[in-house]
């Protein structure tokens, strides 16, 4: 027996990474998991080194970021790699989730895997928001003010919760200090949940583009799929380096190069681009409480997907209607992101409300109806084939 199998610790690594049996038909969309792991490592490492030079005091937070950029050797690289790493983390995560939606990876027996994935998504959004506030630029200050103010919509106790979050009567020194403490903690929580995600994946193995159980047609992870993962890793690092070295502020906001000033309100208050679709859903509802409920529901509705999809065939590879509505959903989601970035005015108000309705309708109305129609068509087609054989 080889050492990697006899050693109790290396045997775990071996069973998950080296000898793990993978379906032979999986394509490059399945490489997003390894890229997400790489992004998490980049974020944790750059974050730890930046935390050595960052000060969470509100009087020094903005200056300490500039100190990292100007005085710390390689500090500019740490800051830009961390900021752009967050954007690339969400790019890979949205692609990973889109792959799961398209190929039906949320279906039984992988409901637990999907649920843990949604939890990782929520934790990642929370971590990104907390980190965005730590910069304490102009947009960070007002973003923190607006988003934390959402809790005031909770009846009876909402205002007390906001004061508790702030540690005062406005975003102030205690706010930034506790946000930084949580921002430092959450990536390690995410790493722990990622391990749970891999454990859940290990129970039934990866799905495949065909949507069938392929236990008889599998290959070891190393060196077939490890090599395939390395290809996308190199492509990712090239694109990531282009942004870090040549266009580091493309996915940021210029107002964050201005120190946070509670006396001056920006022309428009917007979060980072990866939160814009949910920000658009929040703004599409006139009532504050209902807007907050709708925004959180837009994330939690992902958890009902395994129960609303009643199709007898997993995935959309062989389903024309499901393909059409999936790509319409993707277009609608991108449109929500664009609407979240513009001012609340005509015609974007109505467009946001229609897009929000279509977002929820996809999960709660379209998928159940389409899966039922396709089940009937599959049944009719199978009966016709049976009659032809007779």
Curated annotation (Swiss-Prot):
Keywords recorded for this protein, A-Z: Electron transport, Heme, Iron, Membrane, Metal-binding, Mitochondrion, Mitochondrion inner membrane, Respiratory chain, Transmembrane, Transmembrane helix, Transport, Ubiquinone
Free-text remark on how the cofactor is bound: Binds 2 heme b groups non-covalently.
InterPro entries (UniProt xref): Cyt_b/b6_C, Cyt_b/b6_C_sf, Cyt_b/b6_N, Cytb/b6-like_sf, Cytochrome_b, Cytochrome_b_C_euk/bac, Cytochrome_b_N_euk/bac, Di-haem_cyt_TM
Coiled coil start-end: none
Residues holding heme b b562: 82, 183
Gene3D superfamilies: Cytochrome Bc1 Complex, Chain C
Endpoints of the signal sequence: none
Binding site for a ubiquinone: 202
One of the record's GO molecular function terms: ubiquinol-cytochrome-c reductase activity
Superkingdom of origin: Eukaryota
Membrane topology label: Multi-pass membrane protein
PROSITE patterns reported in the protein's UniProt record: CYTB_CTER (PS51003), CYTB_NTER (PS51002)
Transmembrane segments: 32-52, 76-98, 113-133, 179-199, 225-245, 289-309, 321-341, 348-368
Cofactor(s) this protein requires: heme b
CDD domains for the chain: cytochrome_b_C, Cytochrome_b_N
Residues bound to heme b b566: 96, 197
SUPFAM superfamilies for the chain: a domain/subunit of cytochrome bc1 complex (Ubiquinol-cytochrome c reductase), Transmembrane di-heme cytochromes
GO CC aspect terms: mitochondrial inner membrane; respiratory chain complex III
Family of the protein in this entry: Belongs to the cytochrome b family.
Function (record text): Component of the ubiquinol-cytochrome c reductase complex (complex III or cytochrome b-c1 complex) that is part of the mitochondrial respiratory chain. The b-c1 complex mediates electron transfer from ubiquinol to cytochrome c. Contributes to the generation of a proton gradient across the mitochondrial membrane that is then used for ATP synthesis.
PANTHER family, per database record: CYTOCHROME B
Subunit record text: Fungal cytochrome b-c1 complex contains 10 subunits; 3 respiratory subunits, 2 core proteins and 5 low-molecular weight proteins. Cytochrome b-c1 complex is a homodimer.
Other information: Heme 1 (or BL or b562) is low-potential and absorbs at about 562 nm, and heme 2 (or BH or b566) is high-potential and absorbs at about 566 nm.
UniProt protein name: Cytochrome b
Organismal lineage: Eukaryota, Fungi, Dikarya, Ascomycota, Saccharomycotina
């Amino acid at each position: 027996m080889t050492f990697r199998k006899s050693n109790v610790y290396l045997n775990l690594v071996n069973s998950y990474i080296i000898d793990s049996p993978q379906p032979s038909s999986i394509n490059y969309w399945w490489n997003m998991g390894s890229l997400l792991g790489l992004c998490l490592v980049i974020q944790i490492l750059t974050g730890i080194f930046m935390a050595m030079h960052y000060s969470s005091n509100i009087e020094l937070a903005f200056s300490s970021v500039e100190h990292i950029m100007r005085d710390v050797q390689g500090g500019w690289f740490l800051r830009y790699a961390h900021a752009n790493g967050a954007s690339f983390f969400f790019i890979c995560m949205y692609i990973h989730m889109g792959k799961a939606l398209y190929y039906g990876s949320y279906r039984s027996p992988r409901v637990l895997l999907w649920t843990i994935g949604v939890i990782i998504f929520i934790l990642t959004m929370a971590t990104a928001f907390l980190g965005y506030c730590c910069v304490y630029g102009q947009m960070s200050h007002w973003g923190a003010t607006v988003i934390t103010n959402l809790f005031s919509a909770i009846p009876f106790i909402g205002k007390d919760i906001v004061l508790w979050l702030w540690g005062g009567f406005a975003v102030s020194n205690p706010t930034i200090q506790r946000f930084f403490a949580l921002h430092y903690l959450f990536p390690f929580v995410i790493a722990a949940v990622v391990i749970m995600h891999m454990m859940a994946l290990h129970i039934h193995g990866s799905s495949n583009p065909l949507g069938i159980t392929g236990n008889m047609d599998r290959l070891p992870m190393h060196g077939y799929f490890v090599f395939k993962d390395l290809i996308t890793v190199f492509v990712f690092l090239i694109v990531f380096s282009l942004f870090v070295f040549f266009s580091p502020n493309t996915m940021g906001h210029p107002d964050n190069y201005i120190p946070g000033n509670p006396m001056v309100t920006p022309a428009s208050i917007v979060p980072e681009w990866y939160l814009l679709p949910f920000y658009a859903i929040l703004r599409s509802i006139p009532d504050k409480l209902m807007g907050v409920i709708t925004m959180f529901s837009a994330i939690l509705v992902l958890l009902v997907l395994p129960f609303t999809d009643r199709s007898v065939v997993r995935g959309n590879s062989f389903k024309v209607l499901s393909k059409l509505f999936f790509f319409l959903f993707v277009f609608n989601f991108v449109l929500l992101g664009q609407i979240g970035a513009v001012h609340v005015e005509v015609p974007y108000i109505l467009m946001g409300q229609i897009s929000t309705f279509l977002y929820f309708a996809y999960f709660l109305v379209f998928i159940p109806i389409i899966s039922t129609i396709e089940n009937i068509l599959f049944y009719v087609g199978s009966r016709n084939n049976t009659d032809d054989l007779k």
